[in-house]
C-alpha cells in the first residue's frame, strides 16, 4: 500500500512545482504579447507566414518572454511579498527558491535564444535578448525604483513584440513594424497608471515611485487622458501610411473613442473601481486592436 501512496505524493509535488514555475512566466501576459508577435509576422508578408519562422519564432520568443517574467518575479520578490496583488506569488510564498528561479529563468531564456538564433535568425534572437534585458534588468531592477517615468521609459522593451514577429519572418527592420511598436509604447503608460491609481497605497508602502505616488492621483488621471488621445492618433498611423484598410479604421476609431471616454470619466466622473475598469478595458483594447489589424490585413490584401 505504501508504494501507490508514494507515487501519488510525488505526482502531487511535481504538479504543484510545475504550476509554480508556470505561474512565474506570467502566461496571460505572454499570451497577449504573442498575439502581437503573430500580427507582426502576418503583416510582414502578403500571404501565409512560412511554417518554420512561425512555429520556432513563437516558441523562442515565448520562452524568452517567460524568462524575463521569471526574472521579474525574482527581482521583485521582496516587494511582492508586501503587496496584496502579488503576495501569493511563488517566491514570496516559498514555493520556489531564489536559486531555482534563477536557474529556471536562465534555462528557458537560453533555450529560447538558441531556438531563435538557429531556427529563425540572429537578428530576432538578439532583439529578443535586448527586450529581455530591457524589461528584467533596466526596468525591473532599476527604472521601477528610480523614477516616476519608469513605465514610460521601460515601456519600450514591452513594445517590441510586433517588431520581433516582423523580423522573425523578414530578417530586417521595416517602418510598418515600428508603427506597431509605437502603438504599444503609447498604450503602456495609461494601462499601468490606471492600475497604479488603484494600488497607490501599496506602491507607496514599498517605496515604488509610481506616478500617483510621486505626483498625485489627479495629475495621473490627466496624464492617462492625454495618453489615450495620443494613443488614438498612434492607432491611426497604419491607416495613414496605407498599411490598413477601412475595417481596421472603424475598429480602431471605436476602441479609441471608448478608451478616451473611460479616461475622461476617470478624470471628471470618478467612482470606486473605475480605475480598475480602465485598466481592464485597456487589455481588451490592445487585444481587439491587434485582432482587427490581423483580420483587416487579409481582407485588405
UniProtKB/Swiss-Prot annotation:
Which EC class is the enzyme in?
A: transferase
Q: What else is known?
A: Carbon 2 of the heme B porphyrin ring is defined according to the Fischer nomenclature.
Location comes to: Cell inner membrane
Q: Which domain of life is it from?
A: Bacteria
Q: Keywords assigned by UniProt?
A: Cell inner membrane, Cell membrane, Heme biosynthesis, Membrane, Transferase, Transmembrane, Transmembrane helix
Q: How does it sit in the membrane?
A: Multi-pass membrane protein
Q: What is its main location?
A: membrane
Q: In which pathway does it act?
A: Porphyrin-containing compound metabolism; heme O biosynthesis; heme O from protoheme: step 1/1
One GO location term (cellular component): plasma membrane
Q: What is its EC number?
A: 2.5.1.141
Per the UniProt record, one Pfam family is: UbiA
Q: What does this protein do?
A: Converts heme B (protoheme IX) to heme O by substitution of the vinyl group on carbon 2 of heme B porphyrin ring with a hydroxyethyl farnesyl side group.
* Catalytic reaction list: heme b + (2E,6E)-farnesyl diphosphate + H2O = Fe(II)-heme o + diphosphate
Q: Which Gene3D superfamilies match?
A: UbiA prenyltransferase
What is a single molecular function from GO for this protein? protoheme IX farnesyltransferase activity
* Family as reported in the entry's similarity comment: Belongs to the UbiA prenyltransferase family. Protoheme IX farnesyltransferase subfamily.
> What is the protein name stated in its UniProt record?
Protoheme IX farnesyltransferase 2
Residue ranges crossing the lipid bilayer per the database entry: 29-49, 51-71, 101-121, 123-143, 150-170, 177-197, 223-243, 244-264, 281-301
Query: What's a BP term from Gene Ontology annotated to this protein?
Result: heme O biosynthetic process
